[in-house]
Structure formats: C-alpha cells, structure tokens
C-alpha cells in the first residue's frame, strides 16, 4: 500500500473543476507543419499532454513512432492540471518508467523517498507497518509534486524530434474513418509556435491510424467516441496542503482511517508532510473556511500526535472524489487511457500509477504492431490493449473502493474485524509482500515485460 496520493492531476483542471475538455493550438509544431489543406499524418495522435498523455507520447516516440500531442492548457499557466499543487505517490515501478523515458533525473531532484508506511485506524488498537525491507527495495515509492513531473515531461516533449507538440490547442471535428481518424487542431490566440510560418496558421488537420484520449475524466471527445468513464461520487472531497511538523519524517508515510475517510501524510521534505484529507462534503466546506491555526488544530485532532505537532499549512485546495470505469476503453481507432478511462479513490496511491501503466501498455502494444507492420488502430490491436489492462483496472478499482467501504462501515463488529486484520497483517510477512506487490503494480509490470520480451 503506497499511502494515499492527491487525486490524480490529469483528471481535473483545478480545485472542484473539470479538466479542459478538449485541448486549445500548436506550441511547437515542426517547421514543416502542413497547411490546413494538407493533413499531417503522425503514427498516433494523443489528446491531452498532461502527466499520462505526456508519458504516453514519450513512450511511443522512444520506440520510433511519430506522435502529435494536443494539449489544451498553456504549459506555464496555473490552470494546467499537470502543474498544480498536488503531490503524487509514485511506485518504484513508476520511477523505472520515468527513468526509461529520460525524465527521472529531472524529477528526482524534487522527490522524497517513502521508506515505510504506518497504517492505523483512528481510535483503534490495530496497526501495521509496511517497509521497503518487506520487498527488498531501496524505497516503497516517492512523493513528488505533480508540477515537477509535468515540467519534466513537457521539457522532454519539446526536445524530442519525433513529437509534434501543440500547446495550447483545441481539438475539434474528430472523424473516425475506416482507415484513419482525423481531427482539426486550432492554435489559441495567445499560443506560441516554432516558426513564423506556423504562427500564421490557425488550424491544421491531423490524420492517423490511432488516436489516444488522455484528457481526463470529463473528456468531450471521449463522450463522442468511446464514452466517458462512468463515475460514482463518494460524496467526499480531498483537502490537500502541506504542513510543517516538529519532527523529521525519516521517510515514513501515514495512512490513518477515520470515521469519514482516510487521512494521509506523505513525506514532503525534512520536516514537512503533504496532507490528503478525505472529508465529507459538509465538513470540507467548514474546514476550507477555517483560519490556518484552526485548520491545524482540526488536523491535529483528527490525526493525533504520532507525526509530531503540525504548523504553518500552505494554501489548501479541494478535489471531488469518485470512482468508475468506461464500459469500453476503445472504439473505432480511438482508445482512452488514464482518468479518461477510469477513476479511483486516491487511497493507497493508485490513481496516477494506474494511468501511467496504461500509457506504457498502450505504447508496448503499438510498438509490437509496428514491428509486425499491422494497422495501429485496427480492432485487433485495440482489443489486445483492452484485454491487457482489463484485469488490473478492475482489480485496482475493486481494491480501492473496497478499502473505502470496509473502513467506512461504522458497525462495531466491522471495527473489530478491521483492527484484528491490521494487527494480523503486522505479523504476516507473506501477506505484506503480497499487498505491496499488488499496490506497486508488480503483476502488471510482469505482463508488460513479457510483451516487451516478445520483440
């Protein structure tokens, strides 16, 4: 169990607001960008250049594919979902993925290692520790500001010769043909481009055998094609901020289950924690309105003093919590990944890591199809991807939703069962290893390694 992460940044354009539905004109298309009457034909079009879409584009390009990325929000704008104040709890497998994409060195400067996780229930006697020693690694994961990840990805996207990066840009008029999918990309009024010739063009047509939607859970193009991920609200939101404490964290994260939802503290720097506090909506309104001193007092009362005395909170933000998945992640020549395909509760830090594995899996399937000279967007290729991700998506969704329902049950008998379970887990190393392997995505990475080994 990774510890709760902030809700996945590629799913929301800002606090309690949807992400941009369709991206808005090329930031750095190649100097020989086509005229509006001459479609440019990359191998894959990626709608959404945030964390998951950016990772997908780099993974595709690393294997030789030509990629066009269309992102709505200006890269440096506060509205950019990949550049907000949330934190990510990355698994060690995510670190390896980013290292393979050539961006981990930039991210690592901002990363704090999670060495162990303390899990407990407020007011209960059961508790357990999960340690990197349980799985023999250097760390269970890493806490990273989403802004650092987004900036590293965007720098690499602009540098990569195989990537045509349209940002800020809008994608409209998507048409799914028998042999290709086409979309019109319009440059925003304040967009910048790589050349004066490109700057003079307001619209360009992209055509490719495959289009990937990575533009979040409220994707307009997703609703028109494969359908949006059906989401069920938890009637909760996550309040996120960073607090100081009078104790060094020493790499320890906390997952504390309370009567209204999990409360997580993630090691942020030497004496700071990133806070992810699941709150019922009525309580969230009141907590957001508190003064800093009163908020710290409320947080201390909810969590206790195991992590020390809290002080000096940063600005708070809130994000709605929900779960669900698209009935079908793929349609004719279109596939959705990340929050465009599924939404999970941030408990156990699964959301972004799940979307990142979507990106790597799709890139691996496309790479295999290219080696075999197959149509990248044919039904068989998309079915292969959907089957590759079906089991893990369902497993992670059931796991995170199950945790919330089990720990949200206030019946005395269930409380006793929970505390016995936590206490029993503490003395069962095989169960710890199993839990950690599942939450770190080890099974999915094994499947992807097998696919890569078929090259």
Stretches with model-predicted labels:
Residues 40, 110-224, 232-237, 292, ...:
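Conserved N-terminal helical subregion
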Residues 61-83:
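Glycine-rich FAD pyrophosphate-binding loop
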Residues 98, 188-189, 198-205, 210-316, ...:
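Conserved FAD-binding catalytic core of PHBH/FMO-like flavoproteins
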Residues 82-122:
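N-terminal FAD cofactor-binding segment of flavoenzymes
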Residues 285-372, 376-377:
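FAD/FMN-dependent oxidoreductases across multiple families
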């Amino acid at each position: 169990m990774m510890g709760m992460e902030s809700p996945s940044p590629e799913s929301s354009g800002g606090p309690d607001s949807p992400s941009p539905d369709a991206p808005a004109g090329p930031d750095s298309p190649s100097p020989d960008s086509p005229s509006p009457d001459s479609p440019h034909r990359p191998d894959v079009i990626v709608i959404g250049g945030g964390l998951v879409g950016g990772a997908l584009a780099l993974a595709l390009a690393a294997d030789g594919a030509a990629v066009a990325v269309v992102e709505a929000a200006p890269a440096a704008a506060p509205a950019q979902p990949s550049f907000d104040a949330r934190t990510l709890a990355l698994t060690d497998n995510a670190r390896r993925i980013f290292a393979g994409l050539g961006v981990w060195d930039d991210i690592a400067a901002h990363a704090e290692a999670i060495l162990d996780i303390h899990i407990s229930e407020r007011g209960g006697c059961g508790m357990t520790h999960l340690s990197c020693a349980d799985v023999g690694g250097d760390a269970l994961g890493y806490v990273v500001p989403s802004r650092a990840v987004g900036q590293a990805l965007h720098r690499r996207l602009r540098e990569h010769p195989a990537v045509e990066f349209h940002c800020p840009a809008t994608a409209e008029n998507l048409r799914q043909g028998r042999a290709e999918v086409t979309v019109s990309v319009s440059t925003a009024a304040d967009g910048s481009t790589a050349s004066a010739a490109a700057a003079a063009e307001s619209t360009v047509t992209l055509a490719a055998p495959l289009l990937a939607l990575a533009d979040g859970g409220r994707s307009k193009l997703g609703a028109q094609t494969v359908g949006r991920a059906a989401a069920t609200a938890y009637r909760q939101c996550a309040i996120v901020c960073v607090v100081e404490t009078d104790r060094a964290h020493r790499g320890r994260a906390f997952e504390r289950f309370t009567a209204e939802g999990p409360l997580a503290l993630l090691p942020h720097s030497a004496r700071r924690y990133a806070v992810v506090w699941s709150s019922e909506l009525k309580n969230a309104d009141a907590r957001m309105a508190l003064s800093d001193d009163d908020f710290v007092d409320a947080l201390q009362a909810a969590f206790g003093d195991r992590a020390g005395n809290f002080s000096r909170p940063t600005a708070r933000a809130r994000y709605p919590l929900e779960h669900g998945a698209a009935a079908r992640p793929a349609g004719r020549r279109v596939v959705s990944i990340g929050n465009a395909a599924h939404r999970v509760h941030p408990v156990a830090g699964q959301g972004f890591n799940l979307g990142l594995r979507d990106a790597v899996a799709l890139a691996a399937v496309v790479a295999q199809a290219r080696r075999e000279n197959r149509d990248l967007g044919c039904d068989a290729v998309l079915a292969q991807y959907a089957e590759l991700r079906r089991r893990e998506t369902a497993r992670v969704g059931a796991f995170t939703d199950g945790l919330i329902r089990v720990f949200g049950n206030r019946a005395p008998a269930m409380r006793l069962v929970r505390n016995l379970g936590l206490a029993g887990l503490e003395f069962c190393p095989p169960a710890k290893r199993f839990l950690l392997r599942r939450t770190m995505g080890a099974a999915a990475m094994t499947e992807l390694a097998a696919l890569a080994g078929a090259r």
